């Protein structure tokens, strides 16, 4: 049975684990590799057990651990082409680790089928994911300004839906962001 555990969620870092006891993946790696390893240990896992890392987008709170994680773990990185391009520009040398997809594409990862869908966020090519093991479907959608038609279709039929969005109107108004960015975040 598919199980999901959140290791971190929020502006300071995002990382989740999906496992069925045989296949283990991370969704995003926005916290330190040390924190990821500690979280995995609490689940009875180690970094070496990770089969792959699904990356939603290139913002630091979703990918901060990638360079170190890639050195310590042999897992492939699955992300949209635009996101892979942005990450390779930031961290040359990761190119061979990426398995790229176009949002809407499906692919196999172990015995699972991974679905991908476009989300709405201010980055190169943001994506959400569904994970299916033949019996259950889990879907994850993060940092999206609104639910795109593709996201709606991608999460349809999910037994478990994880949404990660943090938005505080008061923090936004009083924070350091310029007005134009505040308007975009607020959906104006």
Residue ranges and their predicted role:
Residues 1-43, 127-143, 160:
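Conserved beta-strand hairpin/beta-sheet module of binuclear metal-dependent hydrolase folds
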Residues 5-16, 52-66, 71, 84, ...:
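Structured catalytic core of nucleotide-sugar glycosyltransferases
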Residues 27-30, 50-58, 78-81, 139-143, ...:
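Active-site neighborhood of phospho(di)ester-bond hydrolases with catalytic His/Asp-centered motifs
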Residues 33-79:
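Active-site metal-binding motif and surrounding structural segment of the metallo-beta-lactamase
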Residues 50, 95, 158-159:
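Short, well-ordered alpha-helix to beta-strand connector turns
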Residues 140-152:
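Active-site glycine- and acidic-residue-rich loops that bind
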Residues 149-188:
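Cap/insert and terminal regions of metallo-dependent hydrolase folds
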């Amino acid at each position: 049975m598919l199980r999901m555990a959140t290791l971190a969620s929020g502006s300071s870092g995002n990382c989740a684990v999906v496992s069925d006891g045989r296949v283990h993946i991370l969704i995003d790696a926005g916290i330190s590799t040390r924190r990821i390893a500690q979280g995995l240990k609490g689940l009875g896992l180690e970094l070496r057990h990770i089969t792959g890392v699904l990356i939603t987008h290139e913002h630091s709170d979703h990918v901060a651990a990638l360079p170190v994680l890639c050195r310590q773990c042999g897992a492939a990185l699955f992300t949209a082409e635009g996101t892979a391009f942005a990450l390779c520009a930031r961290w040359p040398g990761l190119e061979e680790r990426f398995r790229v997809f176009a949002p809407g594409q499906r692919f196999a990862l172990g015995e699972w089928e991974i679905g991908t869908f476009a989300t709405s966020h201010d980055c190169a090519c943001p994506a959400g994911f569904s994970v299916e093991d033949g019996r259950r479907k889990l879907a994850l959608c993060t940092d999206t300004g609104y639910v795109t038609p593709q996201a709606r279709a991608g999460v349809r039929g999910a037994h478990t839906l994880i949404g990660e969005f943090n938005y505080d109107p008061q923090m936004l108004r009083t924070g350091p962001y310029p007005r134009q960015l505040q308007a975009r975040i607020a959906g104006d």
